[in-house]
């Protein structure tokens, strides 16, 4: 295919363009929309500094945007996620309501391809009607859409992370067959037992010599919420979030948090990419960057049939 021009809204550090690079797809990012200062630093550490950032999406005039073929919009999950305030997708009022700011861009620029990503709760009882309305809106513009609910661990990544993806194609049928991959890399392949930067929080002598992973969860006990250590048995991490407590490992009887490097690896980044981010973003902010991003390996398997395989050109 010819050069693919891309606009990444709510870009983070640019997982979508990283996935395109992994596939060797000739592309050019013609613009991004991002307001988080650390995400912007990370983006330009990984990508060309010549890519213009149009800033706050609510203030973008679509007439100022260049032409592009692919529009990605992983809008904020703050008001949808069960771990957030769940205040809903409210136009002009909530962070998740920024979804509707994408309308002006889609209507004016009419990109051939759209890719949306958000948390699983978007398909829940509360938000499903709004999600259906959004798909109906896209249909009215001529877009045919295909929805996927995908877990990163089904794509060879040892992280239990389920997300909703919506692929839309203008004036053409959209029918993609995604290839999954069995896990051959596990959490203990990711964790560096010798990393001295790890923050340990407690010691459990009876687990000395054991390797386990899990999370601290708030559980009610005697009328009070207490932090309880819960373990997983499938050698996958819990969903990488913006906070540390959701992922811990037990190394030789000591309970410690995953490091930012390990979190980024579980999001599909390579060592050299992680090092570039670490040079410009403080450690405390790296957890948020990883937690807000998209697993590269999943994006690769969406883009592969969309842009490389027969049936979708």
List each model region and its residues.
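Conserved active-site and SAM-binding loop architecture
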Residues: 1-313
């Amino acid at each position: 295919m010819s050069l693919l021009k891309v606009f990444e809204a709510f870009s983070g550090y640019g997982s979508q363009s990283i996935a395109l690079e992994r596939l060797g797809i000739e592309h050019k990012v013609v613009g991004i929309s991002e307001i988080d200062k650390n995400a912007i630093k990370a983006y330009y550490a990984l990508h060309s500094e010549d890519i213009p950032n149009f800033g706050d999406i609510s203030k973008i005039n679509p007439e100022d945007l260049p032409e592009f073929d692919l529009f990605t919009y992983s809008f904020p999950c703050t008001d949808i996620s069960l771990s957030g305030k769940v205040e809903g997708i409210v136009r002009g009022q909530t962070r998740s309501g920024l979804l509707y700011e994408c309308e002006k861009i889609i209507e004016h620029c009419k990109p051939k391809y759209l890719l949306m990503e958000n948390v699983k709760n978007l398909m829940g009882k509360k938000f499903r009607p709004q999600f259906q309305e959004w798909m109906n809106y896209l249909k009215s513009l001529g877009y045919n859409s295909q929805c996927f609910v995908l877990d990163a661990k089904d794509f060879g990544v040892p992280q239990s992370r389920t997300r909703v993806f919506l692929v839309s194609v203008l004036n053409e049928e959209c029918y993609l067959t995604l290839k999954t991959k069995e896990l051959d890399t596990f959490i203990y392949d990711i964790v560096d037992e010798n990393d001295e930067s790890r923050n340990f929080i407690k010691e459990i002598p009876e687990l000395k010599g054991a390797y386990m992973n899990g999370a601290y969860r708030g559980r009610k006990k005697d009328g009070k919420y207490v932090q309880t250590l819960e373990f997983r048995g499938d050698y996958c991490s819990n969903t990488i979030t913006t906070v540390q407590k959701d992922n811990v490992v037990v190394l030789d009887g000591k309970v410690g948090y995953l490091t930012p490097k390990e979190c980024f690896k579980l999001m599909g980044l390579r060592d050299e990419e992680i090092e570039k981010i670490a040079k410009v973003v403080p450690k405390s902010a790296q957890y948020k960057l990883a937690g807000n991003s998209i697993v590269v390996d999943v994006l690769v398997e969406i883009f592969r049939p969309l842009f490389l395989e027969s049936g979708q050109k």
